[in-house]
From Swiss-Prot:
SUPFAM superfamilies: TPR-like. Essential for the assembly of the photosystem I (PSI) complex. May act as a chaperone-like factor to guide the assembly of the PSI subunits. TPR repeats lie at residues 35-68, 72-105, 120-153. It comes from the Eukaryota. GO terms for biological process: photosynthesis. This is Photosystem I assembly protein Ycf3. Disulfide bonds: none annotated. Keywords: Chloroplast, Membrane, Photosynthesis, Plastid, Repeat, Thylakoid, TPR repeat. Its main location: plastid. It is a peripheral membrane protein. SMART domains: TPR (SM00028). Gene3D superfamilies: Tetratricopeptide repeat domain (1.25.40.10). It comes from Rhodomonas salina.
Length: 173
């Protein structure tokens, strides 16, 4: 059963109905429409915290989707689920796969930086300063890339880069 038939969320239902209308109007192959349908259902399940169902839908969308740009967003969303479940290594794998297909995906760059920063904090708490420094430097590199692509976003990251001396204020853009 399509998710919109069992979903009580008004905004999600509205998105689903609009997506169905767009799919009917735009020229797309049956496979492209099916891939988008799975992607849409994955987003719906993910927004409700139904991560196993979301992953099933995303994997099916990934199997069907041929467009690299669209595949990058599917991979990105899979990475989001793994990150939210604390599976950071898997999340990094999917974020990197998304970036391989679409290097202009600031949220993926930001999320990679967040994971490295988190690993740096954990290493610092364990007094492993060398690993902490390495992780913080990796986080800085990914945040710099994200900021270059979306200079008005990631304000906290920009402040962290400045306060830690990892980026001079004049080199942000």
């Amino acid at each position: 059963m399509p998710r919109f038939q069992k979903n009580d969320n008004f905004i999600d239902k509205t998105f689903t109905v609009l997506a169905d209308i767009v799919l009917k109007v735009l020229p797309a192959s049956k496979q492209e429409k099916e891939a988008f349908s799975y992607y849409r259902d994955g987003m719906s399940a993910q927004s409700e915290g139904e991560y196993a169902e979301a992953l099933e839908n995303y994997y099916e969308a990934l199997r069907l989707e041929e467009d690299p740009y669209d595949r990058s967003y599917i991979l990105y969303n899979i990475g989001l689920i793994y990150a939210s479940n604390g599976e950071y290594i898997k999340a990094l794998e999917y974020y990197h796969q998304a970036l391989d297909l679409n290097s202009r995906l600031p949220p993926a760059l930001n999320n990679i930086a967040v994971i490295y920063h988190y690993q740096g904090v954990k290493a610092s708490e364990k007094k492993d300063l060398e690993t902490a420094r390495t992780m913080f430097d990796k986080a800085a590199e990914y945040w710099k890339q994200a900021i270059r692509l979306a200079p008005n976003n990631y304000i906290e990251a920009q402040n962290w880069l400045k306060t830690t001396g990892r980026m001079a204020s004049e080199s942000l853009y």
